Curated annotation (Swiss-Prot):
Organism lineage: Bacteria, Pseudomonadati, Pseudomonadota, Gammaproteobacteria, Pseudomonadales
Role this protein plays: Catalyzes the deacetylation of acetylated polyamines such as N-acetylputrescine and N-acetylcadaverine. Plays an important role in the metabolism of acetylated polyamines in P.aeruginosa. Is involved in the degradation pathways of N-acetylputrescine and N-acetylcadaverine, that allow P.aeruginosa to utilize these acetylpolyamines as a carbon source under glucose starvation. Shows nearly no activity against N(1)-acetylspermine and N(1)-acetylspermidine. Can also hydrolyze artificial trifluoroacetylated lysine-derivative, and to a lesser extent, acetylated lysine-derivative.
Entries under SUPFAM superfamilies matching the protein: Arginase/deacetylase
Cofactor: Zn(2+)
Cofactor binding, per record: Binds 1 zinc ion per subunit.
Residues the entry annotates as binding Zn(2+): 195, 197, 284
List of catalytic residues: 159
EC number: 3.5.1.-, 3.5.1.62
Name of protein: Acetylpolyamine amidohydrolase 2
Disruption of the gene: reported phenotype: Cells lacking this gene show a markedly delayed growth with a slight hint of increase after 15 hours using N-acetylcadaverine as sole carbon source, and display an elongated lag-phase of approximately 6 hours before growing on N-acetylputrescine. The deletion mutant strain exhibits only marginal changes in biofilm biomass in comparison to the wild-type.
Alphabetized InterPro entries for the sequence: HDAC_PDAC, His_deacetylse, His_deacetylse_dom, His_deacetylse_dom_sf, Ureohydrolase_dom_sf
Length: 344
């Protein structure tokens, strides 16, 4: 399987995030992607290739012009205030507040985010545009006839919506790739999000559309981040009704429980008859992940890949979460190897 990867991810390395009421060193760090790449090479998964540059237009097909412009200029605007530490928001436009973009950089930072878990640094812009290009390069390979590609994206993307960032995510790589499939002639695209945390951004982007099916298996939002989307009764809106399927599971869920939700999602994908499948590949479902509470073990990821491979769809794997750094490479590549063992 071809892997698309860029060293530019290392340019984004936030020092702290706000979690559990404390500023904590970021769990989302460069060593995550480095460990996955090392495993890709160690098992001989296939060629590793740098991404092409697709410019900003494919990103603007998903993200608002104001949001893209904010991210492009954020660091320079921050420096202009005399500050050079990482950017984190302090206020958000919640219920009954005006939804008007402020002029002040701190106000804009809150306006375009939903939490304090996506620090912007000097290298963030280059890293996030490269991450989007990693996804777009994988999509392009599939559009040109490849049957499967691994886009080793970092930073991840599935918490980012059209006009907000959060949860380590800035541009929604999976959504950008899905839109690119449609723009190149696909009629229907399915997204399967297997990250422990609900892909709220991806759901938000496609919630009122029928040309993208979104399925997600994740921790119950009554108790788990991101809390405010991911319930089973969220089925889509308008013409998108019936094209959104959430499978929230209790803390402690193991493979026996998790795999039942996977089979339910697979049935929806089969019925949808998609032209392509995008897997938002988070492996923070692992039993030793420091910020998640499922109980999957490393061999379970082989079985996960096999189940996805049996769909027989042209498939793009887009890297999302996974914070047990020593095992992230083993678990992510197990999915890919399990997939390759059965995919035709």
């Amino acid at each position: 399987m071809l892997t698309i990867y860029s060293d530019d991810h290392r340019l984004h390395h936030g020092r702290h995030e706000l979690i559990g009421g404390q500023f904590t060193p970021c769990f989302e760090k460069p060593s995550r992607a480095d460990m996955v790449l090392d495993r890709v090479k160690a098992v001989g998964l296939g060629e590793v290739r740098a991404p092409r540059d697709f410019g900003l237009e494919p990103i603007r097909r998903v993200h608002s012009e104001g949001f893209v412009r904010f991210l492009q200029n954020a660091w320079q605007d921050w420096l202009a205030t005399g500050r050079s530490h990482d950017m984190l928001p302090i206020a958000w436009p919640t219920r009954r507040l005006r939804q008007t973009e402020p002029d002040n950089i701190d106000g804009r930072l809150g306006y375009y985010s939903f939490d304090a878990g996506a620090p912007i640094t000097a290298g963030t812009w280059q890293a996030i545009t490269s991450s989007a290009n990693v996804a777009l390069s994988g999509q392009s390979e599939l559009a040109n006839g490849a049957r499967s590609v691994f886009s080793l994206c970092r930073p991840p993307g599935h918490h980012a919506a059209a006009d907000y960032m959060g949860g380590y995510c800035f541009f929604n790589n999976a959504a950008i790739a899905a839109q690119a499939f449609l723009d190149r002639g696909a009629g229907r695209v399915a997204i399967l999000d297997v990250d422990y945390h609900h892909g709220n951004g991806t759901q938000d982007i496609f919630y009122d559309r029928a040309d993208v099916l979104f399925t997600s298996i994740h921790g119950d939002p009554r108790f788990e981040y991101p809390y405010f989307l991911g319930y089973a009764d969220e089925k889509g809106n308008g013409v998108g009704t019936g094209y959104n399927f959430n499978y929230p599971l209790a803390a402690g869920s193991d493979w026996a429980t998790w795999s039942q939700a996977l089979q339910a999602a697979i049935r929806q994908i089969q019925a949808y008859a998609a032209d392509a499948l995008i897997v938002s590949l988070g492996v923070d479902t692992f039993k030793e992940d420091p910020i998640s509470q499922f109980r999957l073990d490393s061999p379970d990821y082989l079985r996960m890949g096999e189940a996805i491979g049996k769909l027989g769809l042209a498939t793009l794997f887009v890297m999302e979460g996974g914070y047990a750094v020593e095992e992230i490479g083993i678990n992510a590549v197990n999915v890919l190897q399990g997939f390759e063992g059965v995919h035709r």
